[in-house]
């Protein structure tokens, strides 16, 4: 069996459990999925966004989260995204044979978003998005950038996300999550030309 076949045949899946004084979360991610999502965080809009992310990235995602929502949504939303980042990192393993970098433009009605990712192991995150409302559903719009940061830093990858224009905050955030799913899908694909090697001149990610 060739090296690249080994990479393709390995199930790229991870389950993360996080229990703190604020949250209790179990998250399972399959990179090479079919877009199936079963997300229950107690935050309806976050459930919607993660379901769209999985669908557009063709990831399989299951999330069960209980948190101190009687205070606010911050701890639960943040910890879910911490778990998602860690699951991405663990599921990718050594990241051998992956495309590594990719980007995606996604429109949602009047809004347009761009997300670019580099799975090179160097965590960084830049989010440029202006929102006109304080909340969309149960999620504060001031949390959106922090959620992407939580995924990127715990996933050990570089993420740049920009809402290029738009009026409706729901549409802007939805375009961001869809673009993130599609960019990550493209970056995690196996490139047979790499022959199962690490996509870096350093030889390690």
Curated annotation (Swiss-Prot):
GO MF entry, a single one: imidazoleglycerol-phosphate dehydratase activity
Q: Which Gene3D superfamilies match?
A: Imidazole glycerol phosphate dehydratase, domain 1 (3.30.230.40)
The places in or outside the cell where this protein is found are:
Cytoplasm
Recorded GO CC terms: cytoplasm
- What does the record give as EC number? 4.2.1.19
The record's listing under InterPro entries reads: IGPD_sf (IPR038494), ImidazoleglycerolP_deHydtase (IPR000807), ImidazoleglycerP_deHydtase_CS (IPR020565), Ribosomal_Su5_D2-typ_SF (IPR020568)
Q: Which reaction does it catalyse?
A: D-erythro-1-(imidazol-4-yl)glycerol 3-phosphate = 3-(imidazol-4-yl)-2-oxopropyl phosphate + H2O
* An annotated GO BP: L-histidine biosynthetic process
Keyword Cytoplasm belongs to the record? yes
Which EC class is the enzyme in? lyase
Q: Principal place where this protein is found? A: cytoplasm
Involved pathway(s) = Amino-acid biosynthesis; L-histidine biosynthesis; L-histidine from 5-phospho-alpha-D-ribose 1-diphosphate: step 6/9
- Which Pfam family is one of those matched by this entry? IGPD
Keywords associated with the record: Amino-acid biosynthesis, Cytoplasm, Histidine biosynthesis, Lyase
Q: What family does the entry list?
A: Belongs to the imidazoleglycerol-phosphate dehydratase family.
Name this protein carries in UniProt: Imidazoleglycerol-phosphate dehydratase
